[in-house]
Amino acid sequence: MVKETKRMIQAKKGIELECKGWEQEAVLRMLYNNLDPEVAEKPDELIVYGGIGKAARNWAAFEAIVEQLRTLEKDETLLIQSGKPVGRFKTHEQAPRVLLSNSVLVPKWAHWEHFNELEKQGLMMYGQMTAGSWIYIGSQGILQGTYETFAELARQHFGGSLKGTLTLTAGLGGMGGAQPLAVTMNGGVVIGVDVDRSRIEKRIATKYTDRITESLDQALAWASEAKAKGEPLSIGLVGNAAHLHHEILQRGVEVDVVTDQTSAHDPLNGYIPEGHSLEGAELLRKENPQRYMALAKQSMKKHVEAMLAFQRRGAIVFDYGNNIRQVAKDEGLEEAFAFPGFVPAYIRPLFCEGKGPFRWAALSGDPEDIYRTDRLIKELFPENEALIRWIDIAQEKVTFQGLPARICWLGYGERMKMGLEINRLVRNGELKAPIVIGRDHLDCGSVASPNRETEAMKDGSDAVGDWAILNALINTAAGGSWISVHHGGGVGMGYSLHAGMVVVADGTENAEKRLRRVLTTDPGMGIIRHADAGYELAKQVAREKGVMIPMEDKNEEGV
């Protein structure tokens, strides 16, 4: 196994190229961006977010990827296997420049034990979703989805606002760190628990969290005062949720909403067992990994028991996609799935319309390029009041991490329209450099994850993985700049397959053709996937938008 060497990487900015074209340069800059200290959780270990979600297998592989990208021709394609460059072929100019497959295991061996053995041997890397596919943009990447989730929850249960409510959650890493700001954006008070003080401090630095304390008494006092005044406030509480949630229950504190985004998907590297410090957990993890995992799983069970107790007391409780319910059930907690996942509870209607987390980053590094695209959004979709409100909130609240970037949920037709107009701005010189356009793997038609995105599908097709593979295949055929297929993101080994796409708007006619195709096929997959599962809204959208579904009228007969 190659010995790791610590290094520090920073996102490259400006208009001077290291590579032979902007498309290759875009890949390189987004790889760097994933590992920028402003962006990544543990950049010296190549870990971007989500437990051990990495950008490259090791530093030797990272250096090899960089060298390949610097010399890659505009008609060549580089192949990445779990964070390591393994091949390079001449293809054509409208083919992807990079194709990536991360963490993919044959189903019988798709579990953490086998993955960990392969990783020890230097044969595999965990790519999470956007870590190994080089399109992570920091906590903003999940922020609007989190905001929309809490907004829909507020509409369903609290009259449209979280004002005067208290949300309890845990896990303030790269993904979970969006929760505090999303709650306060919706007017609520939130206590976010994390055992790692440095993670909360990072959220404080980026203005995603307002306050930090190691005292439960202090956290509850702050929360009570803000709740009584109807003022938004986010509090980062240092501690272990498996313990603190039960303590809050014992005190009889009225909690209105409970969820969780700890790294429960990975019982070895993600979740800290109750009663262990970070240092003690690290030592146990190395000395006795089996014991560590057993303790972590028991703590997760206790954590879910607390969530169920809050639900019985009247709180709105939902799973935020980290597979903690499954672990608790495997540990003997039969009622672990008594509370729903966030997708069937709040997000699926958006998926039926082909909507999802559309994102873009300014390769120039100049925030003004993003502010120009913010104005473009308002020019293109003036009737979408929720979208315009989101852009205003993002401009006020979001601190850029690494390369300036923006995210907003756009649907079928809207994504293509936005992409083509961004390309026009680049061509006309209104933006200083090309723009990278991509998305999370958590999208309407790119993931199979029975405990998250595809939980409780209408036709029972939760575990059908074909859709994620078809998404990658059609986006490759359509000419995405880099396309990825991953396994295990969000929920861990054995529980998900998912695909990512990125396309570069460099102002050229070539880019225009690719944007037109990819930004149609990609959200189109969401519509056909949900129409095939029997969702009437998706069928209606398909008819209205002209999305061809050959056997739509046959699907109801089980064909």
Curated annotation (Swiss-Prot):
Keywords: Cytoplasm, Histidine metabolism, Lyase, NAD. It comes from Halalkalibacterium halodurans (strain ATCC BAA-125 / DSM 18197 / FERM 7344 / JCM 9153 / C-125) (Bacillus halodurans). HAMAP family: HutU (MF_00577). The active site is at 408. The lineage of its organism: Bacteria, Bacillati, Bacillota, Bacilli, Bacillales. Binds 1 NAD(+) per subunit. It catalyses: 4-imidazolone-5-propanoate = trans-urocanate + H2O. Its EC number is 4.2.1.49. The gene is hutU. GO terms for biological process: L-histidine catabolic process to glutamate and formamide; L-histidine catabolic process to glutamate and formate. Catalyzes the conversion of urocanate to 4-imidazolone-5-propionate. Its cofactor is NAD(+). GO terms for molecular function: urocanate hydratase activity. It holds the Pfam family Urocanase_C. This is Urocanate hydratase.
